[in-house]
Structures are given as C-alpha cells and as structure tokens.
C-alpha cells in the first residue's frame, strides 16, 4: 500500500476541504501560464514505464491530492517503483511506522497520523522548527500553498460564491469581508476556548465539523492562511511521543521536546511565533512565562456590544485572572478604515470591562531589539519575572528569535 510521506503528507493535511473534495478537468489549467502547461502535461501524459503508484498519483492529482505539489513524496508498494519520476519522489518507509496507525484515503492510499508525521518531519529540523509546525497542527489555522489545480478550483468556487451573493441581495452591496476572519460574520474556528476556559468542540449548527474558511483582509484580499479546526492537541502529541521514547523510536525525544513547546489554539503564524519566544524554556532562549489561553472568548456586556461591533471577541493571548490580553497584529490587520474601527471598538469595550489590552505588530517582532524592549515592558505589566539577560542567555535568545522569524510555514 502506498503511503504519503513527509512534506507531501503535511500538504495533504493543509489542503482545504473545499479543494480536497473537488475534481478538475485538466484542460482548465491551460490558462496561458508556463505553470499551467507544465501541470497539464503531468496530469495527462503517462510517465515512461508508469507503474500503479505513479498512475494513481497522476489521476488523483486532479482530485483529492490536488493540494499537494508535484512531484510528491510517496512510500510505494512495489520495489520496482523506487525510481523517481515527474510525479513521484519515492521514499523508504520509516522503520518506526506502525501500519495500524495509518489513515486510509481510499483506493489503497494511506497517510500517517499527525503524530506519526511529525516523527518523519523531525529529521533535518530543529526543535524550534518542529514546534512551530506542531503549533499549526494544534492551532486554528493552516498555511496552504496553492498548486495550479487548487488555484483553479478556488477561483471557480469564488465565482460561485459571488453569484450566490448577487442572487441573495440583488447587487454588489454587502460583499465587504465576504470570506475572512476579520469580517463581522458568524465565526468559523476563530476561538479555541469558551468564556469559562472550556475547550470548544468546533462543530457547526448541524453537529458536523466546522468548515474551512480562507483568511482575507476586510477588503477581500486573499491570503495563504485558512481557518480550520485543530488536527490534534499538545497533550495528545506529548502522550504519543512519551510512549515512543519508551519504545526507543528514533527522533521521538526531539519530537517530545518540540511538543512541550506547543500551546493549543494559535490562530496565525505570528501567534505561534510569539508563543515560542515567550513560553519556551530559558534553556532554549525563551522567557518561560506562565502560559495563557490562546484565543479564549470574552463576552461583552450588553451595553458595550454596539461599541465592540459584536457580542464577544476572541483574545489572542489571555490571562483571565490578570485581565490582560496581548494582541498579535499582522501586516494586514488594519487593512482599511472598517477594520480599524472594528478593532478599536473591540479594544475600548474590553478596557471598559477592566481588561488591559497590549499589542505587538509583526514589524516590531521582526526587529530583535524592539521585540526585547516590548516583551520586557509586557512582563512588567503582567508581573512576570523575566529571565536574567546574561550574555549566555542573550546569545540563546537571539538564536531562538532568528529561528522563529526565519521559519516559513
């Protein structure tokens, strides 16, 4: 049985359900671009000496595997298929791979479970890099790098959505924020915990899993980030790798160290980066702050809901006992006037309820000196004791900052 491997397996888990459940006619890829022509040939022209695994990839790359860049990494079934070609990079199955823990994708194709996958991805990555990938898996976001096939599907779906919106409202009014987190609409996986700190179930009104939604600015500019329910939890990863360490599985110790860096519920790469910097142990260069809730809901008082523009909000990093919320604001956070008014109203409402709202932007976090100044000031507000800034610690912290900010999801 062929098994997706490494980054190809990760790409599968990052593929939005809207894409995975679609199928395209390869001819739609002939859009005049070189990339479109290249992928069209891959999907329509059999490889020399094509075996069953390669043929399966060629046919399914227009369906449920279309979110995975080609050539994809695969542990094939037949020994003779261990030759790379235009569609498949063959990999040998990891010795630790437990067939009982593989997930069937139908048609004989398998994919490792998320915990198993991170054992594969541990090789060649640092603990910090692995921890950031785990933060994504345990968070409310996926970074999906579009393939040519996925781009064609999403373009078609976008047109259909716009046509439905026109039919519903009879015009173009009201399209602002039609697909993003920032829009004031029914939420899609934009909180991990309820007001009491209890973990949410991520179910829709009908009891099914909440759908994926593409993150956009309030003016509708698409990004590569999608809102989606978490794939796993930090505790599940820690428990799994603890058992793997006892069994002597290679890379399990590194995976366990990475899993201990993870907080559940990050809603963006910036939140994941900040969490690693501030909550990692001092031995890695972190400040080892007490851990908050990531994306916990706060319900506004009835008289403040008009000001806030909503009934409740999701706080990025919330210490509810201290009534302090740290907000991580990315480049497109205040993309326009409407976005600014929504967020300023939200902050004013939180402060009226006694919360202290602190903010840091991506630009401030990218600059090490600026970030250090801000994080030390945050520690004062929170009453946390920062790690002593010895020369040895500062060296570790600069290296941690370099790894965190250089990492590309």
Which residue stretches match the model-derived regions?
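Short gly/ser-rich loop at a beta-strand->alpha-helix junction or flexible surface loop bordering the NTP-binding
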Residues: 1-249, 399-409
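Surface segments flanking catalytic/ligand-binding clefts of nucleic-acid enzymes
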Residues: 161-165, 174-409
